[in-house]
């Protein structure tokens, strides 16, 4: 079978299902692909094709994730669904599946449950910007008042974590009935798809964001000056533009006097490309791996931040023993390790392998960072955890 050519004519948006175990996330994922395929074309995916999610590795952590795709008339969606709660935690913290928006599935028969709350909190911490609610199993609830009560509880829970609970779209449906082809419930899936289109704004593409390049290597070329190499994370760098060198040391300014790729000279380097950038007036020893080149004024160096962290279990190759306050591992940001100290939440004495935990980290050197930046926690080069900057403090 020949591979279909990928038509990139429509905007691409990343979404995923979140919510409590057995509330119907995977059934809903199957229903969306099935109903949209029937209505707009595309491939339907059966429940069992999605449920036996393959393993993948992200930052040294094994995660089971299913990826499906579907189309509405205006957009192309990539959708992630995870079989187990631990997979969600790992997925969201590592950013293995960056979500532009999430579909929170809540069974009308149960209402919000512990993992409902936990996934909303995680969404807030890791920067999922939009949540749409699918109230599932509504075919099993006859009482209109009960549905209204559950809806109210969900809205309150969202508001508690700073999502706009009162304005969040809530669709009442039945994923199973829609999957079985019941027209009344299929319409609810189309209603949900409509909200995906209207409520989640089109994400800003990496190339449209301000320029940033994590420095991997530094060379000096006699007669030309200092060259830094790395993969452009976002934006575009053009010859002649000013840049800042941020992190580890005092921030310095320079001008890009050349961009090259595979030994060819270019006018610009774009997001996703591996390039060398020639810098004016910078000595080889004034710059090092772990710093970033950035558009002036767009990113600052910080040492202290609040984070959400997942600690690998022993089976995942992590630590065999818990750690306590006073733990001083390395935090690997982009291209380099920086030692840091941790503060655990009130009342938490120790952290076990396999836990996810909120912690405040203080680094010994400043690193260029914004909220949402991912990092690994390492001990002597071995990954023992993964985290995300929830909030820069200083």
From Swiss-Prot:
Positions contributing to GTP binding: 19-26, 81-85, 136-139
Region (G1): 19-26
Region G2, residue ranges: 60-64
Record keywords, A-Z: Cytoplasm, Elongation factor, GTP-binding, Hydrolase, Magnesium, Metal-binding, Nucleotide-binding, Protein biosynthesis
UniProt-annotated stretches for the region G3: 81-84
A single GO cellular-component term on record: cytosol
Compartments where found: Cytoplasm
Major location category of this protein: cytoplasm
Occurrences of domain tr-type G (ranges): 10-204
Region of interest (G5), residue spans: 174-176
Top-rank EC class of the record's enzyme: hydrolase
Catalytic activity entry: GTP + H2O = GDP + phosphate + H(+)
G4 as annotated region, ranges: 136-139
EC number annotated for this UniProt entry: 3.6.5.3
Cross-referenced CDD domains: EF_Tu (cd01884), EFTU_II (cd03697), EFTU_III (cd03707)
InterPro entries: EF-Tu_GTP-bd, EF-Tu_GTPase, EFTu-like_2, EFTU_2, G_TR_CS, P-loop_NTPase, Small_GTP-bd, T_Tr_GTP-bd_dom
A Pfam family of this chain: GTP_EFTU_D3
Keyword Nucleotidyltransferase recorded: no
Residue numbers binding Mg(2+): 26
Subunit-level organization: Monomer.
Role according to the record: GTP hydrolase that promotes the GTP-dependent binding of aminoacyl-tRNA to the A-site of ribosomes during protein biosynthesis.
Family according to the record: Belongs to the TRAFAC class translation factor GTPase superfamily. Classic translation factor GTPase family. EF-Tu/EF-1A subfamily.
Official protein name in the record: Elongation factor Tu 2
Gene from which the chain derives: tuf2
